[in-house]
């Protein structure tokens, strides 16, 4: 059991499960991209970064900000550099392909981890399947690309190497995961604390796991307190501003948690931005979905609960209510941790394996369906509810948009609505509406993804361009306009 062997003959059931899962993931992810349900933030931004890295230059924030700053100041994500050569082949689909493959690999990590001992071995296919259908997994795949998904998929392999006491490989995986995003290292600090608790009886394990914890914490502090502020030319980590309820910086947050523990716990459950009434009870329903999907096992194996503490805090206390619920990529880290805790618990039950597995699968699918159908907002449903017709049905004829896109030269700078940026971003210069900058072309829809403008403001913008002597209308298709800057 010391080697991971992926022969089809030995692990045919796992390969078939993975193949079916990849088809499902493609239906979720690629369909959204084809139908313009991927956006400037974040797939467009990261695809534009791929282009820069593939041409041996640093990526910047010009796509979505007026000023041009190094993109590493926003998130210290080195995966984009690593994956950039693939963009020569897959273009705007590159990161979606990488993300789907990574999740498939994460399922194999679960499979081989459960294969380690006789008690959990009968559950390996069940565990793999449940992992793929977990609400956090599918929600992440339905929304663009994010590097924390790639990091999370290495967690089962990290657990596997720690369990085998393969400390060199475990450290290599730890470093790899840290490279995905600066806040992943904070998550890994708590993961290491949980593992320290789990393996406390083994002196050798304690020593190495404490080293992992120290490395993760040091990496996090160096990134957010020195490296990223230096790159940004700022005094502090820019994303601390998303947590005014905690004080807005790391020191204030720690002080608030220590001095007001009951209020801190209360805030994890209530809408702390009451002006957004549609998000009342959003956090409570998220916890309900998490418990039904297997989160109850975190209380039976509390060292796994320790691991998810920073994810809950960063998810539920931000001033962006869209992160509080079950949608988007903000629940992906729960997938490996909850699944592994769940399998550890049920593998000790003296019941029929298939009955247990089927019951767990029922609760997983039920919680996922509930999360997407009942907890997603009306404007999100077509993206997430992949088993219904609206997921495959565009709101308008997209052929006209694609014809207009084909008229834009590949080397031209372009500004477009957010929904179009995802497919246009693989070029030198691409800007999200309404940042015109030095764009040579503008592809604008009066109704599609007009944020941050209202429909009325967007129509006023289009009318102003039509009378602007520096622009000419190349072609109009229904509500979509292609403008070219005059020489």
Language-model regions: role of each:
Residues 1-27, 115, 121, 204-212:
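Start-transfer (signal-anchor) and selected internal transmembrane alpha helices
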Residues 98-102, 126-162, 176-187, 330-334:
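Multi-pass, polyprenyl lipid-linked donor-dependent membrane glycosyltransferases
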Residues 100, 186, 305-351:
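Hydrophobic/aromatic-rich transmembrane helices and adjacent perimembrane loops
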